[in-house]
Amino acid sequence: MLFESLGASIVTASVDTADEMKLVAEGKCFPKREKAMRFTVCHGVTHEISKTVGAFWYDHAEGKDKNYIAGESKDYMQPAEFVIDCILKKVILCSYSDGGLGRIDSGDLVGWLSGIQNRRDEFPHVWSW
């Protein structure tokens, strides 16, 4: 996998249950990839975890007039993405969102990681836009 060759690991997390996230990991629900994800998929994110990482929390009881997810009736953490340098033990890049925009693009991340490792010749970056 490309990220592994850059010394990076991908970990995802959701408020969903283990059974729901198993379907996501297997590519059997949104987004309908129809192929398994090759990275760690976690479940059970709580409001406390959201506060710990500084992410926005959608409280359904407070925001029921805003349909971020049509028909959805549960609380959830908004997208929060981090690149953590495990040697320095520091977050070196992060992105917080309150919807579908403003996320870290995987192609851009490959370019960024290869740049800080002085390996751009090995991993030529093509801007997605």
Predicted ranges, named:
Residues 1-129:
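Chalcogenol-based redox active-site neighborhoods
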